[in-house]
């Protein structure tokens, strides 16, 4: 096996978005987790993005307690599957403490894999779910997706103003105006390996300087978005949580901070946002 150059970081990292239910991990999922541990990734949030995979995310979280946690939701690409039955299934999933956020949900007008009216309906229903979930104690956070749908996205979120818990706009790749609109709402920002892409991510290198440390989190979005700074590039092109440190390294360079400072702040922010147990309590 070819050795991959991965930055060494002492602080235990948290990957807030890894699609570990993806079938590309079916043959070596345990090895993927072992490599993540070896690269300093102590906890991972497994993204639930459709009706079929959200229950699988929960099963993974239950299989690896304290290390894996889950979200449950329906990505806009799958919006047409959000029926009454699906809504009931999602609400049942959110009764489990291992499910720590509502989503991935939102709007995607870039690819339009689902009709836009269906996307808006599914998003609205999941916002209602989020408004209902966690009462009377604490509302669960939202794990949000937005591509080329900023105006509708903001309008729909505004309709639920004051009724939702904290929110993170995952895999942020947008404009300065979008970033500041999100920060003005006190939302969090998830940064992926898009930042490491010299072809399409260079604008982010200036924008990440403006994200307060207590609003910034990191994610691989594995198996997608393999950082282009990984050397050598694996032939299979599959991203894994083990590569999370490459995002930390680029963030540190762009923000003028040390790698350890970025690692510590993003882990502390993720722990608070998802209400995770302290790292020392993780098994």
Predicted regions and their residues:
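Mid-domain alpha/beta scaffold segments of enzyme catalytic cores
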Residues: 1-283
């Amino acid at each position: 096996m070819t050795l991959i150059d991965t930055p060494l970081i002492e602080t235990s990292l948290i990957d807030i978005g890894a699609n570990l239910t993806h079938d590309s991990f079916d043959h070596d999922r345990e090895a993927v987790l072992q490599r993540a541990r070896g690269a300093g990734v102590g906890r991972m949030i497994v993204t639930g993005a459709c009706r079929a995979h959200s229950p699988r995310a929960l099963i993974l979280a239950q299989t690896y307690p304290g290390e894996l946690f889950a979200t449950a939701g329906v990505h806009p690409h799958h919006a047409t599957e959000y029926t009454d039955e699906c809504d009931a299934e999602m609400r049942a999933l959110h009764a489990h403490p291992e499910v720590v956020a509502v989503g991935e949900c939102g709007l995607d007008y870039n690819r339009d894999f689902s009709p836009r009216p269906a996307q808006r309906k599914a998003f609205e229903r999941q916002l209602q779910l989020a408004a209902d979930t966690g009462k009377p104690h604490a509302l669960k956070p939202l794990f949000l997706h937005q591509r080329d749908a900023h105006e509708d996205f903001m309008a729909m979120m505004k309709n639920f103003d004051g009724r939702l818990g904290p929110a993170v706009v995952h895999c942020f790749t947008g404009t300065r105006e979008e970033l500041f609109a999100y920060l003005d709402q006190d939302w969090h920002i998830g940064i992926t390996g898009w930042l490491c892409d010299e072809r399409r991510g260079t604008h982010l290198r200036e924008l990440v300087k403006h994200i307060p440390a207590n609003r910034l989190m990191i994610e691989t979005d594995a198996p997608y978005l393999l950082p282009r700074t990984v050397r050598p590039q694996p032939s299979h092109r599959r991203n894994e949580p083990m590569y999370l440190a490459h995002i930390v390294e680029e963030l540190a360079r762009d923000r003028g901070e040390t790698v350890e400072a970025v690692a510590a702040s993003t882990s502390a922010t993720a722990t608070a946002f998802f209400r995770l147990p302290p790292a020392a309590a993780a098994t």
